[in-house]
Amino acid sequence: MKLTTLIPAITTALFLSTSITYAGEIQKMNQTEKDVYSTIENMTDAFHKGDIKGVMGSYEAQATVVFEPNKPASDMDQIRQMFEGAFQMNPAFTYSGHDVIVTGDIALHIAPWQMKGKAPNGTEIVQSGLSVAVLRQQPDSSWHMVIDNPHGQILMENK
């Protein structure tokens, strides 16, 4: 697997992976929005622990993840491999906010992010973007990601 493929994979894997949240944002969320946000935090915790089962459990079986701009992946084996490759770089993500919008059983999570990590050769990697994720409430009331795109900023960059 190429480094150029792994870098976006890391980005995707962690676009939601932060414990850094503005306290006011969470306080302003209603319980349903907090439940959606909790899904994001749980995925992040699993990612930081290298827990592929926990990461994959954050997604519906038919999910699509955009590891590279304009290249969505819907094959769960490929998605698993990309996340496992991303674990190796120990990236650190920071976010400048979280926005959660819910209507019925569908939720949208938006978060600007910055990532710092190291390539296998020790080269520092720094990236930033806008994460956009769509989640669906499950019959057991939990929330799982259906679409995960950490490259939402691409549309603005390519004007």
Which positions does each model-derived feature cover?
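Positively charged n-region of N-terminal signal peptides that target proteins for export
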Residues: 1-5
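Bacterial N-terminal signal peptides
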Residues: 8-19
